């Protein structure tokens, strides 16, 4: 799950919106 979230963040381009 954590890995998926990180990948999604990179794709989205929002290194904070997804993480937060």
Swiss-Prot record:
One of the record's GO molecular function terms: IgA binding
Bias type Polar residues, positions: 1-11
UniProt key word DNA repair: no
Protein family according to the UniProt entry: Belongs to the jacalin lectin family.
Coiled-coil ranges from the UniProt annotation: none
Keywords for this protein: IgA-binding protein, Lectin
Region annotated Disordered, chain positions: 1-20
Cited function: D-galactose-specific lectin, binds the T-antigen structure Gal-beta1,3-GalNAc (Thomsen-Friedenreich-antigen-specific lectin). Potent and selective stimulant of distinct T- and B-cell functions. Shows a unique ability to specifically recognize IgA-1 from human serum.
Quaternary assembly: Tetramer of four alpha chains associated with two or four beta chains.
Organism: Artocarpus integer (Jack fruit)
Name by which UniProt lists this protein: Agglutinin beta-1 chain
């Amino acid at each position: 799950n954590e890995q998926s979230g990180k990948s999604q963040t990179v794709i989205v381009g929002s290194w904070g919106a997804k993480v937060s």
